[in-house]
Amino acid sequence: MTISEKKHTVGRLKSRPQFLAVREGEKRRGGFFLLEVLDRKEPDSQARVGFTVTKKHGNAVERNRMRRRLKEAVRLHAGFAMQPGHDYVVVARRDVLDASFQELAAELKSRVETRPKHRRSGDGRPRNV
């Protein structure tokens, strides 16, 4: 790699306040996970990612396996698509264990690349008049 080439790396979310801040952002639902995204309004800083697997999804061995699969999918396929200055939290669902790695990586990449939908001034639901 030459000096002019920029290595695109993804940082990590480590503390509870960082994870809680991302919960206030956009949520992108998928079959294998929920992706929470927060724009930090700092375009010069690198993207950061964190992983959450709740205890209802099995014992520690299974939860760690889910986390490892998601980390590897981000490293190989989705990390380059993450926008600088954004924080991402991947909340795993049980189906992460049963999905093929190609399906998992494709869905993760798709969710990361999805752009937010702009809503009209209303909440989008019809009113009863």
From Swiss-Prot:
Record-listed E.C. numbers: 3.1.26.5
Gene3D superfamilies: 3.30.230.10
Organism domain of life: Bacteria
Entry's Gene Ontology molecular function annotations: 3'-tRNA processing endoribonuclease activity; ribonuclease P activity; tRNA binding
Single GO cellular component term: ribonuclease P complex
One Pfam family per UniProt: Ribonuclease_P
Reaction it catalyzes: Endonucleolytic cleavage of RNA, removing 5'-extranucleotides from tRNA precursor
Gene Ontology process terms (BP): tRNA 5'-leader removal
Record keywords, A-Z: Endonuclease, Hydrolase, Nuclease, RNA-binding, tRNA processing
Residues covered by region (Disordered): 109-129
PANTHER family with a match to the protein in the record: RIBONUCLEASE P PROTEIN COMPONENT
Its job: RNaseP catalyzes the removal of the 5'-leader sequence from pre-tRNA to produce the mature 5'-terminus. It can also cleave other RNA substrates such as 4.5S RNA. The protein component plays an auxiliary but essential role in vivo by binding to the 5'-leader sequence and broadening the substrate specificity of the ribozyme.
Assembly and binders: Consists of a catalytic RNA component (M1 or rnpB) and a protein subunit.
NCBIfam families reported in the protein's UniProt record: rnpA
Database matches in HAMAP family: RNase_P
Family per similarity comment: Belongs to the RnpA family.
Entry protein name: Ribonuclease P protein component
Organism, scientific name: Rhizobium johnstonii (strain DSM 114642 / LMG 32736 / 3841)
Gene: rnpA
